[in-house]
Amino acid sequence: MSDVQSNVKPLTLTTGRVIFAIAGVYVTQSLVSALSMQSLPALVRAAGGSLALAGATTLFMLPWALKFIWAPWIERWRLPPGSQERRSRMLILRGQVALAAMLTIAAAIGWFGREGGFPDTQIVALFVLFMVAGTVASTIDIASDGFCVDQLTRTGYGWGNSVQVGGSYLGMMCGGGVFLMLSAASGWPVAMLMMAVLIMALSLPLWRITEPTRTATIPHVPALGYALRRKQARLGLLLVLMLNSGMRFVLPLLAPLLLDHGLSMSALGALFSGGNIAAGIAGTLAGGLLMKYTSPGRALLTAYGVQGIALLAVVMTLMMAPGHLLLQILQCLVIVQSISLACALVCLYATLMSLSSPLQAGVDFTLFQCTDAAIAILAGVIGGVVAQHFGYAACFLFAGAFTLLAAWVAYIRLHSARELMTSAID
C-alpha cells in the first residue's frame, strides 16, 4: 500500500494558476477599502452629512491595523493542527460572498433611503456595515496571503506581490473613481450593486481551482509568540521599520505639496486617479522583474535607492528649480515616487514572504503588514507636524536620507543573513 502511495504525485498549482486565482481577491480587498475611505465620505457629504462624519471614515483603517490580534485564530482554522487539510480557498470564498452580500445590503439601504433624504440613521447603518466589511476584507487578506506563501515558490513571490500591489491599484480605481462615475450616471445604490456583482465575478478564478493539501500532518498551533521568537520574523519587522519609515513620513504631504505650489484640485484628481495608477502598475511590474533576476538584497537596494534619490530630488527642486518649471518638475517627481513606491513594496513584501514560516504564513505576514500600517499612521502624523514647523524641504530631506541609509543597511543585513532566507523554519 505504501508503494502505491509513494507513486501518487501530490496536487500542486503552477505559479500562473495561483496568481490568476488570487488576483481578483486582492482587487476586492482594495475595492472595499476605496468604497469605505474614498467614496463613502463623498456620499455622506452629498447626502448632507457633516464633515466630522465624513472624516470619521478613517476609522475603517482600524481592522487593517489590528488584524494581527485575530490572525492566529484564523490561521488555526486555515491550517488545522494535526491535519493535512488546507482551508484557505473555503475561507476566502465565503468571505467574498459575505462582502458581496454586504454591498447588496448597502445598496438596499440607499434605495430605501431615497425618499426620506437619507436620514442619519441610515448613514450610521452604512458606517456600521462598512466597518464589518472592512473586518471581513482584512480577515480574507490573512488567508489569501497565507495561500500565496503556501502555493508559490520562492521564485514566484515577486510575481505574487506584483499581483497583490497591482491589484490594490485596480481595486482603488474601481472602488473610487469608477464607482463615483457609475453613481453619477445611475445612482449610488445601483453602482453599489454593480460592485457586488463585480466581487462575485472576481471570485470565479479561485472557485475553479482545488487547493492542495499539506504533504504531512503537522501538530503546530499558530501563535504570535512563535512568530516573535523566530529570527526571520524579527528580521522582517526590522526591514519594515527601516525601509518604509522614510516614505511614510512624507506620503500624506504629496497632495498638499502640489496644491501649495499652484496645482488645481481637478488637475490633482486627474494626476492621482490616472497618472498614479498607471505609474503604480508599472512599478509593480518593475518590482516583479527585480525579484526574478536579482537577489532580495539587491532588489531592495535598487528599489529603495531610487525612492530615496527621488525624495532628495524634491528637495533640490524646491531649492533650485525656476519658478515657471517648479510645478511641472514636482508633478514628474510624484509620478516617479509612485513607480518607486510600488516597486519597493513588491520587493519588500516578496522578501517578507520568504521570511514567513510555512507553519503559520498568515500570522507572520499579517504581523509585517500591521507593523507597516502602524508606521504609516505614526510617521504620517509626525511628518505633518514637522512640515508645519520646518517646511516641505526639511521633511523630504530627512525622508530621502533615511531611506538611502535604510536601503544600504538592509542590503548589508540580508547579505550577512542569507541562511535565514533559505531556512523558513528554525
PLM regions and their residue ranges:
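C-terminal ends and interior cores of transmembrane alpha-helices
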Residues: 93-119, 306-323
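C-terminal transmembrane helical hairpin of 12-TM major facilitator-type secondary transporters
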Residues: 298-348
